[in-house]
UniProtKB/Swiss-Prot annotation:
One of its GO terms (molecular function) is small ribosomal subunit rRNA binding. Residues 120-131 have a biased composition (Acidic residues). It comes from Salmonella dublin (strain CT_02021853). Transmembrane segments: none annotated. This is Small ribosomal subunit protein bS6. The keyword Transmembrane does not apply. SUPFAM superfamilies: Ribosomal protein S6.
Length: 131
């Protein structure tokens, strides 16, 4: 089986359906003896340019190992699903399991925000104890 990276963008009005879509696509992959190495839900993000008069979309990234028949089925499903605005399937040489740069940046921002909140709370406690 080959390794693939799949990115699809969902219409922003259909964001509630994304978990069900991910579950359905994951079941199709694992049902055909495939493996999901990485699954990231990037959420709603700004588009670089408008697509069908839309400026935002819900992004999902999957790195999978699956037979060609499943990939063909997924591409057909993406094509005929009105909620999927764009999709891209790329073959990769190896399984990619580490976090993508998008998730790494998000985690770094979250850590910095948490550190800042902790420092602010510590400063407030120190100020209260001095009074």
């Amino acid at each position: 089986m080959r390794h693939y990276e799949i990115v699809f963008m969902v219409h922003p009005d259909q964001s509630e359906q994304v978990p069900c879509m991910i579950e359905r696509y994951s079941a199709a992959i694992t049902g055909a003896e495939g493996k999901i190495h990485r699954l990231e839900d990037w959420g709603r993000r700004q588009l670089a340019y408008p697509i069908n008069k839309l400026h935002k979309a819900h992004y999902v990234l999957m790195n999978v190992e699956a037979p060609q028949e499943v990939i063909d089925e997924l591409e057909t499903t993406f094509r005929f699903n009105d909620a999927v605005i764009r999709s891209m399937v790329m073959r990769t040489k190896h399984a990619v399991t580490e976090a993508s740069p998008m998730v790494k940046a998000k985690d770094e921002r979250r850590e910095r925000r948490d550190d800042f909140a902790n420092e602010t709370a510590d400063d407030a406690e120190a100020g209260d104890s001095e009074e």
